[in-house]
Amino acid sequence: PHPLDEVNLDYRVTGGARAGSDDEVMITACRKEIVEDYTAVMELAGLRAVIVDVGLFAMERGYEFVAATLGESLEGRAIALMDFGDVSTRLDLFVDGAVIYGRDQNFGGRILTENIRSRYGIDYREAEALKRTGDLPQNYEADLLAPFREAMAREAARGMEFCLSARHGVEHVDALLICGGCAQIPDMAPLIESHVGVPTLIADPFAPGSGIRASKLVARYAPLMIKAAGLAVRGAT
């Protein structure tokens, strides 16, 4: 939908040529202004961007570290990864390490932050900080957190329903991994599991078996670090 001079293009050969067939090539396109926005932010921080990667590709590489921590062969098994972000939630379905289905949902942790801001009459930055520390009035858990947890579990179930109704050849999901900031809400995994009926775990790219050694500070935020882990090995794999 955009002129070629307004986009950045790159490609990758994803499959070798079989007898009598052509190579499989993946082409990625992104508007130049989006790439320029990212590089400008890095320049403000005194950094120079060598590579601007695609989030999905970074998640695919990061998923490999998480898969290595599960302690069993995942060959032929369907594993869903649900990333609860600030403004949206992304569900990707992996089979043999490759994404065969993906969908974004309009749900994220900002909903809870806005509810905190509105209920207690504070600004957004303070609401976000208090959400992370949990230093809120006693009625917070019953009035705000519990309803959000239920809404989050319903969104997970909704995402799984869409996933299973898509025509991608997979009839059931073997496990659901959750990540992102909201995945750190206490007892979130078992609540989601009760809604989706699929074994649900918190994704941790630093757990034993991943091959990554992280500092205690970084490990505290493990469910938020899958994409970062994938970015870190860009070009190294």
For each feature predicted by the language model, list its residue ranges.
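Glycine-rich phosphate-binding loops at beta-strand->alpha-helix junctions
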Residues: 148, 171-201, 206
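Gly/Thr-rich phosphate-binding beta-strand-loop-beta motif of the actin/hexokinase/Hsp70
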Residues: 21, 69-101, 108-111, 116-119
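Phosphate-interacting basic helix/loop segments used at nucleotide- and nucleic-acid interfaces
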Residues: 66-77, 157-164
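Adenine-nucleotide phosphate-binding core of ATP-dependent small-molecule kinases
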Residues: 114, 118-119, 127-174, 182
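Glycine-rich phosphate-binding/hydrolytic loop that grips phosphoryl groups
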Residues: 58-61, 183, 201-237
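Glycine-rich phosphate-binding loop plus the immediately following alpha-helix
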Residues: 35-61, 98-138
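Conserved beta-strand elements of the Class I
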Residues: 26, 78-82, 177
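Active-site neighborhood for divalent-cation/phosphate handling
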Residues: 1-67, 175, 205-211, 224
